[in-house]
Amino acid sequence: WVVSRLGKGVVRALDTPNFVANRVGVFSILAVMHHTQQFGLGFDEVDGLTGPLIGRPKSATYRTADVVGLDTLAHVVNTMQSTLPNDPWHAYFTNPAWLQALIAKGALGQKTRGGIYRKVGATITVLDPAKGAHRPADRDIDPDVAGILKLRDPHARFAALRASPHPQARFLWAVTRDTLHYCAVQLEHIADNARDLDPAVRWGFGWK
């Protein structure tokens, strides 16, 4: 009835913090935030990399955070931080200083007409955390990295990302590596089998 009449799917999850979709999806967001800083990339640059090019929604990562609400995201992160003290990736479960600063100013994302992104007239601007100010957004992707992402064979695509010295490629490899590793380690704690994980992130976060 849920599937045929409501058009919804059922995800069987174990009783753990954030269940399946949020546990994996929010971890992926945190991995993106961590490696954004590690590789010195811009938020708009990262959204260009983590959207449709890798089978995720156009809103990608930071724009998705704005849509969800930065205060809501911070609450979910705080839940992970306080309830999962033994998680091997616990160091990732923290709200960056720039995120806390936006929340303190009441810049919560789309619902307050400004957060990580902000529209000024006809111009979309994005936060530069180093300067604490917004600048015009530009999702510029290196042509070589874009070429790697067009490779149809996943093995060849991941191998090329791992081998590339370009920061954008190294960033994508690091995020993919961490997310897959996290799923492999935590699967037994959050779901009965791997088949329950894939629909959870497809339906919950729009991943393909």
Predicted segments, located by residue:
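N-terminal glycine-rich phosphate-binding loop for ADP-containing cofactors
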Residues: W1-K208
